[in-house]
């Protein structure tokens, strides 16, 4: 299965609680954190929710 590299590029301060929870679910805590996740529909949905705080490769 394909994987996606997700990097946090913006702070979570002042964001909606649901968006903070989504970032936690993705495994991102701090600016500059990078995680590798499987390319599934669930992960794609999470990415769509917080697209403005992350970078995808």
Swiss-Prot record:
It holds the Pfam family Ribosomal_L30. Belongs to the universal ribosomal protein uL30 family. This is Large ribosomal subunit protein uL30. Signal peptide: none annotated. GO terms for biological process: translation. Disulfide bonds: none annotated. GO terms for cellular component: cytosolic large ribosomal subunit. Part of the 50S ribosomal subunit. GO terms for molecular function: structural constituent of ribosome. Keywords: Ribonucleoprotein, Ribosomal protein. InterPro entries: Ribo_uL30_ferredoxin-like_sf, Ribosomal_uL30_bac-type, Ribosomal_uL30_ferredoxin-like.
């Amino acid at each position: 299965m394909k994987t996606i590299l997700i990097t946090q590029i913006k702070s979570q301060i002042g964001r909606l609680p649901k968006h903070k929870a989504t970032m936690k679910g993705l495994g991102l805590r701090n600016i500059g954190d990078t995680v590798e996740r499987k390319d599934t529909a669930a992960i794609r949905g999470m990415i769509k929710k917080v697209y403005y705080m992350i970078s995808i490769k």
